[in-house]
Amino acid sequence: MAAPPRRPRGPQPRDDAAIDVQVLDRQRALTISAAWLGRVVRRALARQGVTRAEIAILLVGDRRMARLHEQWLGIPGPTDVITFDLADGGPRGGLQGDIAVSAETARRVARELGWQPRHELAYYVVHGLLHLAGYDDHDPADRRAMRARERVLLRAAGLPPPPGSRR
């Protein structure tokens, strides 16, 4: 008689709990592991209490980011991150969105601040995730709350807080 199958230890994912992260790397400024960035996203979302999400991260250079910035926000020139909330409030729930990140900007700003470019890039991604979760940074009080939450999520992802007084 065969032994019954062993049950795995620890919490098991529910059928409705899934974090899908896709990383599309269209830049040459930094070498970024898609697996590492996916782990950053999953850990940050877990800390945020998100159990379902479909997130696409687009890594681009400054030229492509400038085109996206102009096309979607009407603002000329590159920026660090643009978030596209794609959630339609349908029955699946969870977060759905695309986050475009300029790796060139991350490299440049990291050099100015004296920390690792991949950490700056991860900071941009976490910032985008918080926008998808409903955070905003248009007024000082909201900005302070968002910055504090960014630090919490970066820590949850195993990353240091961003240096500098701007954060």
Give, region by region, the residue ranges found by the protein language model.
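An acidic/histidine-cluster motif and surrounding catalytic segment
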Residues: 1-122, 130-167
